[in-house]
């Protein structure tokens, strides 16, 4: 059986038909809150059940509970606050019980039923979520650029958020049907924001060995400068899957969600989201969702000990490297040879090669994947 949604029920908050038309008209008369791409993605993810059991943006009780205990106020595991920030003007013009229109790029996308408006302490927030308030951390910097009040309450989506990669996107309702159709009972999900190298392939295939299917689910959306652009990641995975994966054992879909770079907490968040898609297992990488040296390499593994009730099984697959003596990709558990035989695949090293227009060697990256990446004039975010 694919996993049950987090909290037991898949949330759906999308207006349809006549109701939708009426709400779009009404939204034009409401106080409106303009949101950026990341918040528009959060709206869609709430509405389509990616963030089940959340039905909107967090009210104070849930928000503080998540910061302090990594659980919602009903004790369900949840590690990343899903919040809507607004300025003083909105605060003055809105009361609890009001309806507010959420606008993205000049178009109303949702209506929020305001339950609470409250100030937040950004310092406390960053220390809890990121374990640092250092402004060099991209997630911290983003928080300090946000507005001073939070609006909490349930929402209903009233028009689609444009998605440039629509043909690659499946919502939880759809992946659950897909996994059932394929007859998969055990599904391993893989989260990524990178183009695939042989280390990723090794980890994915190790997970696939003892599950029925692999769900590759890269994030698209805001990333820090130096990360790969979305279309490069998608095309690179298409090439890898086409040439090196058994088609009936892999499902591929993109997820529009911002990277927070919150390390251990974000690893748990990524697992919960994939549970909502129907995955039963989640591959947790070394320094998962980390950035710089803010988190220890295996901190993202340790945090899962706090959540025996998570409802999705974390898979801690050791980092793979190429061993010249073994003649292939291995990990520390199965390779007896000393360090001088081991070639570790570092993302930094790979990015540097690609930046210089060099083709990575075949023990690092499949030639078909390298071909795709090098075909882009500029594969990186700036």
UniProtKB/Swiss-Prot annotation:
Gene3D superfamilies: HUPs, Sulfate adenylyltransferase
GO MF term (any one): ATP binding
Catalytic activity, EC: 2.7.7.4
Alphabetically ordered keywords of this record: ATP-binding, Nucleotide-binding, Nucleotidyltransferase, Transferase
Pathway it works in: Sulfur metabolism; hydrogen sulfide biosynthesis; sulfite from sulfate: step 1/3
Pfam families: ATP-sulfurylase, PUA_2
Catalytic activity: sulfate + ATP + H(+) = adenosine 5'-phosphosulfate + diphosphate
GO biological process terms on file: hydrogen sulfide biosynthetic process; sulfate assimilation
SUPFAM superfamilies associated with the record: Nucleotidylyl transferase, PUA domain-like
Superkingdom as given in the UniProt entry: Archaea
PANTHER family: PTHR43509, SULFATE ADENYLYLTRANSFERASE
Protein family according to the UniProt entry: Belongs to the sulfate adenylyltransferase family.
The protein's name: Sulfate adenylyltransferase
């Amino acid at each position: 059986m694919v996993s049950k949604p987090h909290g037991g029920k898949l949330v759906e908050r999308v207006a349809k038909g006549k109701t939708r038309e009426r709400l779009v008209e009404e939204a034009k008369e409401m106080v409106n809150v303009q949101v950026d791409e990341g918040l528009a993605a959060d709206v869609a993810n709430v509405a389509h059940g990616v963030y089940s059991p959340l039905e909107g943006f967090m009210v104070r009780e849930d928000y503080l509970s998540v910061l302090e205990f990594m659980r919602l106020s009903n004790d369900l595991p949840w590690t990343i606050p899903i919040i809507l920030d607004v300025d003083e003007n909105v605060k003055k013009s809105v009361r609890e019980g009001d309806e507010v229109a959420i606008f993205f790029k000049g178009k109303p996308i949702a209506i929020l039923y305001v339950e609470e408006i409250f100030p937040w302490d950004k310092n406390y927030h960053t220390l809890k979520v990121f374990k640092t308030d250092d402004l060099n951390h991209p997630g911290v910097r983003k928080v300090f650029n946000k507005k001073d009040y939070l609006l909490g309450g349930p929402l209903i989506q009233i028009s689609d958020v444009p998605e440039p990669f629509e043909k690659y996107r499946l919502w939880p309702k759809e992946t659950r049907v897909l996994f059932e159709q394929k007859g998969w009972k055990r599904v391993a999900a893989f989260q990524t924001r990178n183009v695939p190298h042989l280390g990723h392939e090794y980890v994915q295939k190790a997970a696939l060995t003892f599950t029925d299917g692999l769900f590759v689910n890269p994030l698209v959306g805001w990333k820090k400068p130096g990360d790969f652009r979305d279309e490069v990641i998608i095309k690179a995975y298409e090439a890898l899957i086409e040439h090196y994966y058994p088609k009936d054992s892999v499902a591929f879909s993109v997820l529009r969600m911002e990277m927070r770079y919150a390390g251990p907490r974000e690893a748990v968040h990524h697992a919960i989201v994939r549970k909502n898609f129907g995955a039963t297992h989640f591959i947790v990488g070394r320094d998962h969702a980390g950035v710089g040296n803010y988190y220890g390499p295996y901190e993202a593994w340790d945090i899962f000990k706090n959540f025996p009730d998570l409802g999705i099984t974390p898979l801690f697959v050791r980092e793979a490297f190429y061993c010249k003596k073994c003649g292939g990709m291995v990990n520390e558990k199965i390779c007896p040879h000393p360090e001088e035989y081991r070639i570790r695949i570092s993302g930094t090293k790979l990015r540097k090669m690609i930046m210089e227009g060099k083709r990575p060697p075949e023990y690092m990256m499949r030639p078909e994947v390298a071909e795709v990446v090098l075909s882009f004039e500029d594969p990186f975010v700036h």
